[in-house]
Amino acid sequence: MIKEPEFREYDPKKLEEKVEKFWSENEIYRKVKELRKDGPKYYFLDGPPYVSGAIHLGTAWNKIIKDMIIRFRTMQGYNVWRQPGYDMHGLPIEVKVEQALGLKTKKEIEEKIGVENFIKKCKEFALNNLKIMTEQFKMLGIWMDWDNPYMTIKNEYIESAWFTLKRAWEKGLLEKDKRVLHWCPRCETALAEHEVRGEYKLRKDPSIYVKFPVEGKENEYLLIWTTTPWTLPANLAVSAHPDYDYVKVKVEFNGREEYWILAKALVDKVLGEIGVKGEVVEEFKGRELEGLRYVHILMDEYPRQKEFKEKYEWAHRVILADFVTLEEGTGLVHTAPGHGEEDFEVGQKYGLPVYSPLDDQGKYTEGKWKGIYVKEADPKIIEHLREKGYLVKAGEIEHKYPHCWRCKTPLIFRATDQWFLKISKVKDKIIKENDEKVTWYPDWVKIRFDNGVRDSGDWVISRQRYWGIPLPIWQSEDGEIYVVGSWRELVELAVAIEVNGERIELPESYEEKLKVIEEKLGPEDLHRPYVDAFIIKVNGKDMRRVKDVVDVWFDSGIASWASLGYPRNKELFEKLWPADFIVEGEDQVTKWFYSQQAASIVAFDTVPYRRVAMHGYVLDEKGDKMSKSLGNIIRPEEVVERAGRDTFRFYMLWATNPWENLKFSWKGVEQVRRMLNILWNVYVLASTYMSLDNFDPRKLNPDELPFREEDKWILSRVNSLISEVENGIESFYLTKATRALYNFVVEDLSRWYVRLIRKRLWVEGEDPDKLAAYYTLWKVFDVLLRLLAPFTPYIAEEIYQNLIRPFTNVESVHMLDWPKVDEKAIDEELEREMEFIRRIVEAGSAARQRAKIKLRYPVRRIIIETEDETVKKAVERLNRILRDQLNAKEVKVGRVERELTIKPNFAKLGPEFKGDAKIIAKWINENGRELYEKGELTVEIDGKTFHLTREHIIVEEKLPDFFVSEEFEGGRVFVDKTLTRELIAEGLAREFVRRIQEMRKRLDLDVNDRIIVTIETTDENVELLKENLDYIMRETRADKIVFGKAKGYVVEWPEVQAKIGIEKVEE
């Protein structure tokens, strides 16, 4: 049976700890999964968070969304695959471990600690953070298979990556190439395009104008502009646009006459910046400059430039390129094929060498600045050019520049040999499959995704690092390669392993090989340096592994099948794949969402997921990013500690549309906490009265209960709510779901329905009217708790256990089915009518306040003026509710006669009728009523005809003194404020009832406790109160009311000129 609640006040911490203990002791999570094991499969793929540290509000928001979806689908009957994942390789972890070990370079890693120990430390770091993050996710009430997470470091996961790369190789989509790529000089590795997107940050760099002497022409120069002086040693050409107009300008510079060539459109801007005046002496198209040779300004400092000039026809000449713009610079672009993507492409067209005299740390390997880091060389190069007379102007520019997403070092463009997935060959396939098979939430993100695919280049997947999935590429000395697709294949092809520099031949038998491998290397581990030891033989050639590891974005990109253990475990893959739903943050549109589709098209020629949703970032209240430097970071634990898990969860799903950025607000958190407190208070009210009366819904036949209109209304509303919440979740418009729930709890249930039924709950005995209210409230909770369960699982469980479970025999609210709409219960007309009733009550209450009539004092009558038929029907059908809520003896639709004063509107008459305005005004003063009633008239005045409308008059109305009015959407409420003795006596009785009830509450009396009341007050009050003694006794559960000296627990109430005493009647 229903019991009185354990906590009368909502205490999230106590409640949630209690529920957590109940779940744990009763293995509810396991039972929920067991219950749905035969349901239709639903593959929810968890995008793996990176294990670089503790979770933040954004990570929490992501997991809360996921948990809500999983709980919702489970209640719908699905057997949900809910395996959490962790992204555990990559440079961010390497960087953290390097810092912990005091290492700064790859050389130090290899020489001071060794690759094997370094990888061991990375693994320890990753596993430790996994444990921390798992506990944090559990703290948020996230129900996933925490005992069986997928980890990108597991052998079977790595093998999935090898399988995918082998498929790419077999399809001709994996190849080695020399390209200009983003390079991190600190991490000493290449970065893929998608890793750099979003990593452009403001920084200051040099901004210099430099002149290149035209060969064979005295004092004639090509004028170029650059922000990367360090690339000038690698300059091999100057690019011009074939269709632009260029000019030769005569200038006076440093005391001598010179001729500068630049784009015509930029002359004024460039000369203005430099601070010189010029005269155009010649004009030509860009294509006419093609082949013009110049003298390399650092030929002596970088002797290989002499070799290039002799060997390559187009070295140190003007070449043509469409990428040249007039947005900035001079219209002539310094071109270094070893340091620019577009430079590389045009260089290939003209047969130029790819020259990049840098090592992996971004230091020069030759020439004047050998051994110096490029950014440190910038000022030295600028000063050197100044000394040589080639520097025209040096300044600074603040611009967005790409940085390493792992260590935040400024990147450089550098030509290197790398391994590529040829995404350019499958772009169209990705877009086609995506458009046909994937549903996006919101749908406009699909366009952004498609555009990102169109703009993407080939995927550089090799990284020159340690802690990652080893590239499964083995290469012979003569350059032939073989891609290994699995551990078994590697063992089968292996002929030897190398241990500490010693080659150990392997036997032919697979089983015998495994014994030797385990004896010499230990158990299977597909990481470096374990796999580096394997020497395989293909086509009669020994092959050793290419030392690179795979881009960490590839790890997560294969998650939809690698997490299922495919291809080692085909059964799960065949049952579940592709994923039914994924959801991640906005930055993943061109990252994880992209890497998955790219990898999946390579492996399976189709998409890896059916539905995908995007959410925004969490910012602070002002809209700023949370960061240590700003001191505005709020940790998830802090929110849970202050407000509770349910509040945190609901707030994150309620505060903003999921695809927008969430500006975290403590005020908003508190607002949600109040909503849950309101829900708790309604539960306390219901369970308190139901427990006293031993209420059992099973003993009642709802067909025989005398439901009132308000009961039918709330049952209709809660059934409408099912659709609102469900549609909100299905469309990923989560705020529609949460705000519908919020408004239902606060407005419909608490502020309206409970307000309407309070008196019915107070009645003693087996009253049918009270039982109808009980049954309605119980039924509402039965539906509402199931709707709330995915959002606020703790409070839903606690209320369910006491209010609903005694009559269902279902162990947990999370084991219930998602509610189905009872179409018979929905009455849309009643819902519309009740909405008008609430507006009328609000307007009527406002009118009473203006008249300074307290709600406890009844009024004689209220008149509703309206033209709206729905309002008229509502007032008739729900008249009892209006009378009760407005404390009025009579409420009816009608018209209140008032005195109208009609005056001319000179603001309109003057401009329109000018000199005739006065005679029209005189006519309005005499006949204005007719114009008001008809709306418009054509009248003849002094022989002239005028067309008049209501715009030409001002109407002032004067109500009878005993009326006060207020407008509402649909009409107007008129309250008769005349107070008779009878009304005053009734109001005074209510005033005393409220104070006695307050005293009962202060004494913490049970609702069934009887009392004796003594009242010490004025003679006038005594006479008035005697007229309603039965009412006072009934409402306060008093056995007797005595007028005289107050006794027992006494409180003085000056506002009613009384002292009241109450004493509990002892049984």
From Swiss-Prot:
This is Isoleucine--tRNA ligase. GO terms for cellular component: cytoplasm. It catalyses: tRNA(Ile) + L-isoleucine + ATP = L-isoleucyl-tRNA(Ile) + AMP + diphosphate. Pfam families: Anticodon_1, DUF5915, tRNA-synt_1. It is found in: Cytoplasm. A motif ('KMSKS' region) lies at residues 625-629. The keyword rRNA-binding does not apply. Its EC number is 6.1.1.5. It comes from Pyrococcus abyssi (strain GE5 / Orsay). Catalyzes the attachment of isoleucine to tRNA(Ile). As IleRS can inadvertently accommodate and process structurally similar amino acids such as valine, to avoid such errors it has two additional distinct tRNA(Ile)-dependent editing activities. One activity is designated as 'pretransfer' editing and involves the hydrolysis of activated Val-AMP. The other activity is designated 'posttransfer' editing and involves deacylation of mischarged Val-tRNA(Ile). InterPro entries: aa-tRNA-synth_I_CS, aa-tRNA-synth_Ia, Anticodon_Ile_ABEc, Ile-tRNA-ligase, Ile-tRNA-ligase_type2, M/V/L/I-tRNA-synth_anticd-bd, Rossmann-like_a/b/a_fold, tRNAsynth_Ia_anticodon-bd.
